[in-house]
Amino acid sequence: MALTPTDVSRIALLARLELSEAEQSAMLSQLNGFFDIVERMRAVDTTGVAPLYTPLSAVQEVALRLREDAVTEVDQRQANQLSAPAVEAGLYLVPKVIE
């Protein structure tokens, strides 16, 4: 899939970009280079290849480095709600905006 200068002009118009002729030519070259890479990746047969969440998992066992989900802050709900105009059962009350 190769883009034309007309395509780049339309993309620039939609993005509200003002491109000079030199910028438009450079953008055309960059976008076509990107689409060339995408086409080459599409051509690779990946049937039977398991997806990787990190490239390291292809060469070694990788454990997810996630922290334990633990509460680290104290509950300050009541203090935070002191300045609210209306609170009920620990919830902020707001005016109805959609009828």
From Swiss-Prot:
Q: Which InterPro entries match?
A: Asp/Glu-ADT_sf_sub_c (IPR036113), GatC (IPR003837)
In its UniProt record, a GO molecular function of this protein is: ATP binding
Q: Could you tell me the EC number(s) of this protein?
A: 6.3.5.-
Any keyword Magnesium? no
* Root EC class: ligase
Q: Give the UniProt keywords, A-Z.
A: ATP-binding, Ligase, Nucleotide-binding, Protein biosynthesis
Superkingdom, according to UniProt? Bacteria
Record's catalysed reaction(s): L-glutamyl-tRNA(Gln) + L-glutamine + ATP + H2O = L-glutaminyl-tRNA(Gln) + L-glutamate + ADP + phosphate + H(+); L-aspartyl-tRNA(Asn) + L-glutamine + ATP + H2O = L-asparaginyl-tRNA(Asn) + L-glutamate + ADP + phosphate + 2 H(+)
A biological-process GO annotation: glutaminyl-tRNAGln biosynthesis via transamidation
List the NCBIfam families: gatC
Which family is annotated?
Belongs to the GatC family.
Fill in the subunit field for this protein. Answer: Heterotrimer of A, B and C subunits.
Physiological role: Allows the formation of correctly charged Asn-tRNA(Asn) or Gln-tRNA(Gln) through the transamidation of misacylated Asp-tRNA(Asn) or Glu-tRNA(Gln) in organisms which lack either or both of asparaginyl-tRNA or glutaminyl-tRNA synthetases. The reaction takes place in the presence of glutamine and ATP through an activated phospho-Asp-tRNA(Asn) or phospho-Glu-tRNA(Gln).
Protein name per Swiss-Prot or TrEMBL:
Aspartyl/glutamyl-tRNA(Asn/Gln) amidotransferase subunit C
- Its gene? gatC
